[in-house]
C-alpha cells in the first residue's frame, strides 16, 4: 500500500475505537510481536510513517517494541497515548527527535472529551440494569420513562455492571483477552464515567477550558445532590439533547497547562483530530479550529500561543512527519 502511495500505517490499540456494532477495530488486541512485525513492514517499504494510538495498558511492553523500531528504522513515527504515563513517552520522543529521529508525539489542543448524552454511545447510566431495559426505545419514549421520579430513584440506587459487560463483549467477539486485561479495560470504563471533577455541562458555544466551578462535582456540592443525580437531571434537559463534556485525558488544576508545555517541544505535532473513529462519543474534527481560536485569540485562563507557531504545528510540521519537505528546517 505504501509503495502505491499510502502515507503509512496507523494502528489503533484503544478501547474507544470500535465499529458500529461495538467490535474493536483490527489491531486493538494484537500482540507485541504482531505489532513489531507490522511496524517493520513499514520500514521494509523504505518510506512512510507509523502511527500508534494506544491506551498503553502495559506501558513497558508497548515501549519495548516501539523503542526497537525507533532504533532500527529511519521511517517516521507518531504517537498518541490515551492512558498511562504519557509524559514518559513524550519525553522519550523528544529525546529521540533531538538525536535526528523523525519521532513526534501528537497532542490535542484541548482535552480529549467524551460527549455523554442520551443519543451518544456512552453515558454514566448505560450500564445500569434499569437503563438497559429501555435503551432500545426511541429517545422520546426513553425520556418519558426517565422523567418519572420513581424510575429516576430506581436507577440512582443501582450500580453499573462494567466488568460483566466487558466480559460479555469479549466472549461475543471471541476475544483472546485475559481476565486481567478485561479487568483493566473495565477500570478504564469506570474511570471514564465517574471522574466528576472533570465533567462539565457542554455550553453553547463550548468552553474547552472550564473551571472547577463548572464541574459536575462542584454543581453537586452547590445543589446538595449526588453527582449521579446532577448528571441524570442534565441529561433529560432540552428534550434529551443536552451533553456532558467528560475530559478523558488529564486536566490538572482545571487548566490546559500541558498543551502550553507540549507546544514548546521541538518534536510535538498537532493531532488527535481524526473526527471519524468514534463519532458517537467524541467530536474532535474541530480541533484545528480550537487551536486557532482558543490558543491564538480567545484564551483568558493563561498565556496565548503565537498564531504562526500553531499554523506551523498544523501544516509544515505535519508534512515533515509524513516524509515531505525533506531537508527543510
Regions found by a protein language model. Name each.
Residues 1-2, 24, 42-43, 58, ...:
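Polyanionic/metal-chelating signatures
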Residues 1-49, 53-72:
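Hydrophobic, small-residue-rich alpha-helical packing segments that form membrane-like cores
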Residues 8-11, 49, 53, 100, ...:
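Flexible, glycine/charged-enriched surface loops at secondary-structure junctions
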Residues 20-31, 48-52, 77-79, 245-248, ...:
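Glycine-rich tight-turn/loop motif centered on a GG-T
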Residues 224, 274, 292, 310-311, ...:
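Hydrophobic, well-ordered secondary-structure elements that form the walls
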Residues 228-235, 306-316:
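Short, well-structured alpha-helical segments that form the helix of a local strand-helix-strand
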Residues 243-259, 305-311, 319-329:
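Acidic, glycine-enriched loop/beta-strand segments at the rims
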Residues 256-264, 268, 273-305, 323:
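Substrate-recognition/cap regions that form aromatic- and gly/pro-loop-enriched pockets
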Amino acid at each position: 500500500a505504501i509503495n502505491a502511495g499510502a502515507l503509512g500505517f496507523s494502528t489503533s490499540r484503544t478501547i474507544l475505537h470500535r465499529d458500529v456494532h461495538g467490535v474493536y477495530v483490527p489491531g486493538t488486541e494484537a500482540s507485541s510481536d504482531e505489532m513489531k512485525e507490522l511496524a517493520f513492514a513499514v520500514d521494509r517499504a523504505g518510506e512512510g510513517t507509523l502511527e500508534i494510538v494506544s491506551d498503553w495498558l502495559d506501558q513497558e511492553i508497548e515501549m519495548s517494541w516501539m523503542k526497537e523500531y525507533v532504533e532500527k528504522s529511519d521511517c517516521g513515527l507518531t504517537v498518541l497515548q490515551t492512558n498511562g504515563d504519557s509524559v514518559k513517552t513524550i519525553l522519550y520522543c523528544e529525546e529521540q527527535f533531538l538525536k535526528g529521529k523523525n519521532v513526534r508525539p501528537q497532542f490535542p489542543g484541548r482535552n480529549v472529551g467524551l460527549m455523554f448524552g442520551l443519543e451518544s454511545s456512552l453515558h454514566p447510566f448505560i450500564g445500569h440494569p434499569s437503563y438497559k431495559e429501555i435503551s432500545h426505545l426511541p429517545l422520546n419514549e426513553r425520556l418519558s420513562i426517565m422523567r418519572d421520579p420513581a424510575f429516576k430513584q430506581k436507577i440512582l440506587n443501582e450500580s453499573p455492571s462494567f466488568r460483566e459487560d466487558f466480559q460479555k463483549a469479549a466472549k461475543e467477539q471471541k476475544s483472546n483477552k485475559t481476565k486481567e486485561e478485561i479487568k483493566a479495560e473495565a477500570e478504564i470504563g469506570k474511570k471514564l464515567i465517574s471522574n466528576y471533577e472533570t465533567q462539565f455541562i457542554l455550553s453553547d458555544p463550548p468552553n474547552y477550558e472550564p473551571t472547577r466551578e463548572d464541574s459536575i462535582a462542584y454543581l453537586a456540592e452547590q445543589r446538595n445532590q449526588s453527582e449521579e443525580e446532577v448528571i441524570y437531571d442534565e441529561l433529560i434537559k432540552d428534550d434529551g439533547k443536552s451533553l456532558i463534556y467528560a475530559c478523558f485525558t488529564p486536566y490538572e488544576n482545571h487548566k490546559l497547562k500541558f498543551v502550553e508545555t507540549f507546544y514548546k517541544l521541538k518534536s510535538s505535532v498537532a493531532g488527535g483530530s481524526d473526527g471519524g473513529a468514534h463519532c458517537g462519543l467524541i467530536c474532535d474534527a474541530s480541533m484545528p479550529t480550537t487551536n486557532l481560536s482558543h490558543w491564538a485569540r480567545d484564551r483568558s485562563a493563561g498565556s496565548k500561543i503565537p498564531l504562526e507557531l500553531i499554523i506551523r504545528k498544523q501544516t509544515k510540521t505535519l508534512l515533515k512527519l509524513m516524509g515531505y519537505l525533506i531537508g527543510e528546517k
